[in-house]
C-alpha cells in the first residue's frame, strides 16, 4: 500500500507532531486496507479517552452524581461525538481504506471516523505519554466541555420509560417493521407503541438503536403536549 500523504499537515491540525510517524499512519489504516491496521490502537485510545474525560468531568462537576457523570461521559465519548471531531479535522481525507470501503464511502462513515480518532489517541500515547494525550484531548473537547451539563443527558428511550413509569403506564413496545439497503448501508424503520397514543410512532435511521431513539423522542413530544 502507498504511504498516506500529508501526515505532517494532519499533525499540525491535531496539534501534535509525531516522532514515530508510522504510528499515525497505522492509526489511520482501516482493517480493510492492511494487516497492520488500527484496531489495537483504537483499544488503547478508547481507554485513555474514557479516563481523561472522566477525570475532567469529576473535577468540573463536584456535586454531580455518579449517574450524571456517567451520562455526560457517554455523551462526550460516543461515536457520534468522535465522528464530529474527526470531521472538524477532515480526517476522512487521510484514511487508508480497502477498495470496498472506498467504494461505499467509508471515509464518511461515522463508525470508521470515530474508531480512527480513538486510534490516534492510542498512537499519541505510545509516541509520547498519557499527559500529552490529556492536554490534546481536553483541547479538542474544550468547547464541548464548556457547554455540557448534568441535566438532559439521558437518551429519549430512558426519558420515555421514566415518564411512563412515573404515571404507572405500561412500557413502550419497539418493533422493527422494515430493514432496507445493502448490508454496509442499511436503513432501519422502527415503530414505537405506547398506551397513550392510538397510532404507533415511526423512527428511521441507519441503526436499530438510533431509529428507536428517534421514535421515542417523537413519542415524548406528543404525549407531553
From Swiss-Prot:
GO terms for molecular function: double-stranded RNA binding; metal ion binding; ribonuclease III activity; rRNA binding. GO terms for cellular component: cytoplasm. GO terms for biological process: mRNA processing; regulation of gene expression; rRNA processing; tRNA processing. Residues 7-129 form the RNase III domain. This is Ribonuclease 3. It comes from Shewanella loihica (strain ATCC BAA-1088 / PV-4). The keyword tRNA processing applies. It is found in: Cytoplasm.
